[in-house]
Amino acid sequence: MARINDEYDIGAAFEAIENELIASMIRNMESHKQEEIDEDKQWSMWQTEMLKSLEEYKHNNQKKYGKQFKDINEKIAELIRTARAEGNMQQEITILNAIKKVFPANKISKGGTAEFFKLNDRKLEALIKATTDDMKKAETAVLRMANDQYRRIIYNAQVYANTGAGTYEKAVDMATKDFLKAGLNCVEYANGARHTLADYADMAIRTAAKRAYLQGEGMKRREWGVYTVIINKRGSGCPCPLCVPFVGKVMIDDVWSGGPKDGVSPMTGIKYPLISAAIAAGLYHPRCRDSHTTYIEGVSTPPDGKYTREELNNLAEKNARRERQQYAERQEKKYNRLSQFSLDPENQKKY
């Protein structure tokens, strides 16, 4: 297994496992080629042999990938802990730089923050446990789906052969076509959408690492008694549509920094909207690429978050372009599977 350094590597590792599961399945189909496609007796014998190979497939996969999944899950926990440490360190740098600009801040006494930090430690461990538990369920699901698809292909191949598929390769390709189009989409979301293990892992780990990073930042702000943050424009980047209403707004971080729930800044008495309310309205949804930074009243540059009509139109076009790109990438993966794992030469060429 390749070295894992970030969520991209984890997604790639899961995608490699998915492709290995499919490749192993197709190799078995190829090695048990049925020569007499119109002989029912021969097909019955073929099914018996293939069902035996399925049991071996299940056993081998559980043994091989069980160890790989365990290693990956340990890396996931490590990445989440590292994300919090990085957020904490970066925030220390931000605040120390602000102090150089005569920011009147003093660290809050240990006693005043000890319980807060204990709570955050528990939150971090709960986040890690929830993420790895969900990944274990998804990992179990991908192996189960591979087994189910294997069995379905065995039975469907004979059905297609009996309806005039022509050759063994064509019969198997007809039986695998829908499966190869979709991939091992073993995870079903609440809205009914199905996703592969690699796609789900990308979303889950990116979301967990982001929350851990924001928690690390928040803990450091709490140490210095700073609770105000701002959702900045993303340079040349494009904010998520759900996050646009919050860009450029100063807020009280009552989620990760433990800011006052009434939204009133202890430093100036100014009342700001709460991060928790923004999250409830869609900020920091899964796969969100936006983030907030510390806003130090009297030191940080006042917000410039209002978008012109032209900027909003550009944002809409960028989002549409990104969606088209993501669709094209999904189509590319689909046809790569069909081309790589089809047995019939004509189908390989077609896809």
Predicted region positions:
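N-terminal leader/targeting and assembly helices and adjacent pre-domain segments
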Residues: 1-175, 180, 298-299, 303-351
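A charged, amphipathic alpha-helical module
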Residues: 157-200, 215-219, 224
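Acidic, glycine-rich two-metal-ion catalytic cores of nucleic acid-processing enzymes
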Residues: 195-306
